[in-house]
Amino acid sequence: MAVLINAKMDALLESTSRSFYPTLKYLPKKIRGQIGLLYLLARVADTIADSKEGETSELMKILTQYNEVAQGKSDLLPDFTGLAEIQDNPAEGELLLNVQDVIDSLEEYTVPDRERILECLDVIIGGQILDLERFGVAKEGGEISALNSN
């Protein structure tokens, strides 16, 4: 497939999305890169939210900080080194170590495209934060998390 975003992002996209990446060729060429970048941005958030270690409040803080940087509201990107080291999937660890490059790739697109991508990302991260609030950190061994009764 031709370059979607740029060589580095394409490699991250291919390594983190084995089943999604091949389907991009079926989308119109005009939007493949934007959809691919949104996938990477969302995958960063998903990797943070699904981390099996750390306190719920800390993961929510990291998600919020990540979103604020992606949305252009802050320049203080969290240090993802610790989270990257605990990932079972090495490609997800590599993605976390390259978050700034993923965010910087937004500049490849027009302002309206960036706005749409970031609007979608904001909704996705909002849902992930809500899941963390309701269910807490992902648990090993298929343990079920109960909802609060209120």
Model-found features: residue ranges?
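Acidic catalytic motifs of isoprenoid enzymes
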Residues: 1-150
